Amino acid sequence: MASLLDGVNAATLRSDVPAFRPGDTVNVHVRVIEGNRSRIQQFKGVVIRRQGSGVSETFTVRKVSFSVGVERTFPVHSPIFEKIELVTRGDVRRAKLYFLRELRGKAAKIKEKRDN
C-alpha cells in the first residue's frame, strides 16, 4: 500500500520548481479562472514560510498592495500556477518570517544575499 502511494505521489510532483527559501522574493504566475476564461496573474512578494514535504508541501508569499499586507499560500506541486520566478535571494536567519507582519516601510525590507 505504501509503495502504491509513493508511486502516485511521485507522479504528481513538479520538476520545474526552482530552489527557493524563506526570505527570497518570488514572482508566482497564477492561473485565474473567471467564468469560462482563464488568464495569468502575477503575485510578487517575499516567501515568509515553506512547510511540509512531498505532495503536501506549501509556501506562503507576502506582499503589500495599496498599503495592505496580502498573504497567499500555494501548494508547491499545484497545477494552479504556471511558473515560479526567483527574483532575488534574501539574507535571513529564520525559517518562518512571521515578524514581517508587524513591520512597516523600510523596517520590513530584507537584505539581499550577496554571491561570493
From Swiss-Prot:
Disulfide cross-links: none
Pfam families with a match to the protein in the record: Ribosomal_L19
Choose one Gene Ontology CC annotation of this protein and give it: cytosolic large ribosomal subunit
Q: One GO BP annotation here?
A: translation
Q: Which InterPro entries match?
A: Ribosomal_bL19, Ribosomal_bL19_CS, Ribosomal_bL19_sf, Translation_prot_SH3-like_sf
Cite a single GO MF annotation: structural constituent of ribosome
UniProt keyword list: Ribonucleoprotein, Ribosomal protein
The yes or no answer to whether the keyword Ribosomal protein is present is yes
Q: What does this protein do?
A: This protein is located at the 30S-50S ribosomal subunit interface and may play a role in the structure and function of the aminoacyl-tRNA binding site.
Similarity comment: Belongs to the bacterial ribosomal protein bL19 family.
Can you name this protein?
Large ribosomal subunit protein bL19
Tell me the organism: Streptomyces griseus subsp. griseus (strain JCM 4626 / CBS 651.72 / NBRC 13350 / KCC S-0626 / ISP 5235)
